[in-house]
Amino acid sequence: MPSDAAQEFVILGLTRDGRQFRPTDWAERLAGVMSQFRPGGPQRGHHLGYSPWCVPSLRDGVKCVVVQRALRDSDVLAWDFCINFARDNDLQVA
């Protein structure tokens, strides 16, 4: 799990034993759930785009979600949700 000093952490779409995580759109789903957590708080229409604090991406061809520390500073429960998602699904975190 991320250190307290980390400015971001990456949830990789690989389990700790190296299997690809399913469903294939998991990163977009997680980022979609987190879309309301953003600078200035939730606002009308912001569910149509990802939060800058929780963004789906690719790292070395592997789907991932990049989670910024600013999310923790704004809402520790949302941060914990992302950490617990990775832990509950046995996903690699960088």
Predicted regions: what is each one?
Residues M1-V33:
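N-terminal, charge-rich interaction modules
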Residues P2, D25-A27, P42, H46, ...:
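Generic preference for flexible, low-structure residues
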Residues M34-R38, D90-V93:
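Glycine-rich loops and low-complexity Gly/Arg-rich segments
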Residues E28, S35-D73:
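Short, intrinsically disordered low-complexity segments
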Residues D60-A94:
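Short, compact, well-ordered microdomains
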